[in-house]
Swiss-Prot record:
Pfam family, one: RRM_1
Superkingdom in the source lineage: Eukaryota
Source species: Gallus gallus
Keyword annotations from UniProtKB, A to Z: Cytoplasm, mRNA processing, Nucleus, Repeat, Repressor, RNA-binding
Signal sequence residues: none
Region feature Necessary for nuclear localization, mapped onto this chain: 347-399
Function: RNA-binding protein implicated in the regulation of several post-transcriptional events. May be involved in mRNA translation repression and stability. Mediates exon inclusion in TNNT2 pre-mRNA.
Record GO terms (molecular function): BRE binding; mRNA 3'-UTR binding; mRNA regulatory element binding translation repressor activity; nucleic acid binding; nucleotide binding; RNA binding
Keyword Nucleus tagged: yes
Protein name: CUGBP Elav-like family member 2
Entry annotated with the keyword Kinase: no
InterPro entries according to UniProt: CELF1/2_RRM1, CELF1/2_RRM2, CELF1/2_RRM3, Nucleotide-bd_a/b_plait_sf, RBD_domain_sf, RRM_dom
Length: 484
């Protein structure tokens, strides 16, 4: 038989040559034919053989061509990854041969939407046959057998399908339809995977949103004065400040990790699918946007400050989630810094200085990322807030914080960097002993609004650095006898 079973007549024009792996090396074409013929007439079987051996030995794989495409697809559905042949450890692998991939069905298959429910398959064929040979035409129907108003049409070549799209898409409005006819390439497996990832991301964000608002009930202990300020802050003009609280409440390391993984996958799929329309800004900020507060992400009119807070808060969130249980978990900060190019090989040690270095570099990495994504916005915000270091300017009532248990090494810039993500800092000061010129390990931070101060208290009070836990509370009013 010379390695093949041939017939005088030819297979259908759309017949598929299929590669089959995981077959016994002892099997001949005859045994393989008996395996495949239940699914349809076999045109040809070629067993791949090692010609370096005498006689040539089977490599345990072959090519099979059925007379019809339908038979090949039925065989693949019944055998691929399902049936294990005698003496084999793995199930049969059956897929179109590489030579078939250039003309894959998904490259020639069209989705037709907004089709009149009165149309049948013949009507669709008549409509699209002027553009080339149609291999398959199928109207989607419900369990009741009635048309769902859409169909699939597969042409012999991709060029035919493209011509049909150009001529027919939105060319007419069919009877009983509210919009013009839709003609586009049917979703590929890659498209379906991308959509699945996006749905997972949306679900994750919904869960996070629910958990976040649930945790905001912890603010119920605020005085009526602060509740009024919170209500005022939720107005459109102050939404950026309020989003800081939403970001700080209810997030944990697992949620952040899951969100980051899904967003990166979805962004990569989206970028590869639309390279011609890619925008450097949208591409860079897309993944970050998916991880920011749901409020900030869904508000088109968020202020420049809100956008900046969303970017810078990401680093703090990850750091807070991972670092609150002590030095051994400072790797969370290190990972965030490394992601953004901010961590050197010697950034971590077991001492307090190493902890400070990792923390500082994590913030530095976030700033570098933000600067690359939004250069103008970042530079403006940075200039405004850098001047706050060392200043003792006070904000409005309820916006001034007292922080103690600060590490000895912390200076004005360090405390500024730590509290910037929660809002617009107008002053940040670490108090120094004038005689020793060493830090007294406490300081003050003032915001331009009380909401940011409350967000900072929620996130930073009890935050552990080295062997110390920060204590963050509102600075007492000037009318009180003590500052704290």
């Amino acid at each position: 038989m010379n390695g093949a079973l041939d017939h005088s007549d030819q297979p259908d024009p759309d017949a598929i040559k299929t590669f089959v792996g995981q077959i016994p090396r002892s099997w001949s074409e005859k045994e393989l034919k008996e395996l495949f013929e239940p699914y349809g007439a076999v045109y040809q079987i070629n067993v791949l053989r090692d010609r370096s051996q005498n006689p040539p030995q089977s490599k345990g794989c072959c090519f099979v061509t059925f007379y019809t495409r339908k038979a090949a697809l039925e065989a693949q559905n019944a055998l691929h990854n399902i049936k294990t042949l005698p003496g084999m450890h793995h199930p049969i692998q059956m897929k179109p041969a590489d030579s078939e991939k250039s003309n894959a069905v998904e490259d020639r298959k069209l989705f037709i939407g907004m089709v009149s429910k009165k149309c049948n398959e013949n009507d669709i064929r008549v409509m699209f046959s002027p553009f080339g040979q149609i291999e398959e035409c199928r109207i989607l129907r419900g369990p009741d057998g009635l048309s769902r108003g859409c169909a699939f049409v597969t042409f012999s070549t991709r060029a035919m399908a493209q011509n049909a799209i150009k001529a027919m898409h939105q060319s007419q409005t069919m009877e009983g339809c509210s919009s013009p006819i839709v003609v586009k390439f049917a979703d590929t497996q890659k498209d379906k995977e991308q959509r699945r990832l996006q749905q997972q991301l949306a679900q994750q964000m919904q869960q996070l949103n629910t958990a976040t608002w649930g945790n905001l009930t912890g603010l119920g202990g605020l005085t009526p004065q602060y509740l009024a300020l919170l209500q005022q802050a939720t107005s459109s003009s102050n939404l950026g400040a309020f989003s800081g609280i939403q970001q700080m409440a209810g997030m944990n390391a697992l949620q952040l990790q899951n969100l980051a993984t899904l967003a990166a996958a979805a962004a990569a799929a989206q970028t590869s699918a639309t390279t011609t329309n890619a925008n450097p800004l949208s591409t860079t900020t897309g993944a970050l946007g998916a991880l920011t507060s749901p409020v900030a992400a869904s508000t088109a009119n968020s202020t420049a400050g809100a956008a900046m807070n969303s970017l810078t808060s990401l680093g703090t969130l990850q750091g807070l989630a991972g670092a609150t249980v002590g030095l051994n978990n400072i790797n969370a900060l290190a990972g965030m810094a490394a992601l953004n190019g901010g961590l050197g090989a010697t950034g971590l040690t077991n001492g307090t200085a190493g902890t400070m270095d990792a923390l500082t570099q994590a913030y530095s990495g976030i700033q570098q990322y933000a600067a690359a994504a939004l250069p103008t916005l970042y530079s403006q915000s940075l200039l405004q807030q850098q001047s706050a270091a060392g200043s003792q300017k006070e904000g409005p009532e309820g916006a001034n914080l007292f922080i103690y248990h600060l590490p000895q090494e912390f200076g004005d810039q360090d405390i500024l960097q730590m509290f910037m993500p929660f809002g617009n800092v107008i002053s940040a000061k670490v108090f120094i002993d004038k005689q020793t010129n060493l830090s007294k390990c406490f300081g003050f931070v003032s915001y331009d609004n009380p909401v940011s101060a409350q967000a900072a208290i929620q996130a930073m009070n009890g935050f552990q650095i080295g062997m110390k836990r920060l204590k963050v509370q509102l600075k007492r009013s000037k009318n009180d006898s003590k500052p704290y």
